[in-house]
């Protein structure tokens, strides 16, 4: 599971997921999976999508993960009264804005990449689209 090695502070404010995304271009591979909607991905979802893609392309080619879960999400235990401080860190998320490239792939055919990204997209809670590298 992806998570930061060290953080200056253990817990974080909830915050808002507004604004535009950085990393909107396919920069490492030839094909990419781009987020159309806004939301957040957990470390488990990122890993599940990666496994689905890796299995489908049968370990040929290369996959880049362009997102990293760096925000801790806390929750209090069941049947605990309110107050008494913030809950414990339960999992890590990455906030996604529209246009962010989530995964990239290289070394496979476009047809195989489309199929692999379709399997990955089924594991994610966001609406996504297939993109290719623009050559200038």
From Swiss-Prot:
UniProt xrefs under InterPro entries: Ribosomal_uL16, Ribosomal_uL16_bact-type, Ribosomal_uL16_CS, Ribosomal_uL16_dom, Ribosomal_uL16_sf
Keywords: Ribonucleoprotein, Ribosomal protein, RNA-binding, rRNA-binding, tRNA-binding
Biological process annotations from GO: translation
A single MF term (Gene Ontology): rRNA binding
Transmembrane stretches, start-end: none
One GO location term (cellular component): cytosolic large ribosomal subunit
Domain of life the protein comes from: Bacteria
CDD domains the record matches: Ribosomal_L16_L10e
General function of this protein: Binds 23S rRNA and is also seen to make contacts with the A and possibly P site tRNAs.
HAMAP family named in the record: Ribosomal_uL16
The family this protein is said to belong to: Belongs to the universal ribosomal protein uL16 family.
Oligomer and partners: Part of the 50S ribosomal subunit.
PANTHER family xrefs: 50S/60S RIBOSOMAL PROTEIN L16, LARGE RIBOSOMAL SUBUNIT PROTEIN UL16M
Record protein name field: Large ribosomal subunit protein uL16
Source lineage: Bacteria, Pseudomonadati, Pseudomonadota, Gammaproteobacteria, Alteromonadales
Gene symbol of the encoding locus: rplP
């Amino acid at each position: 599971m992806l998570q930061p090695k060290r953080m200056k502070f253990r817990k974080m404010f909830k915050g808002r997921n507004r604004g535009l995304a950085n990393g909107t271009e396919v920069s490492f591979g030839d094909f990419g999976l781009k987020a159309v909607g806004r939301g957040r991905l957990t470390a488990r979802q990122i890993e599940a999508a990666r496994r689905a893609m890796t299995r489908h392309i049968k370990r040929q080619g290369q996959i880049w993960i362009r997102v990293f879960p760096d925000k801790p999400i806390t929750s209090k235990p069941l049947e605990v009264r309110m107050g008494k401080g913030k809950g414990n860190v339960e999992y890590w998320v990455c906030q996604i804005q529209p246009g962010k490239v989530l995964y990239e792939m290289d070394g496979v055919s476009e047809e195989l990449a489309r199929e692999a990204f379709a399997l990955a997209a089924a594991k994610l809670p966001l609406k996504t689209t297939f993109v290719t590298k623009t050559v200038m």
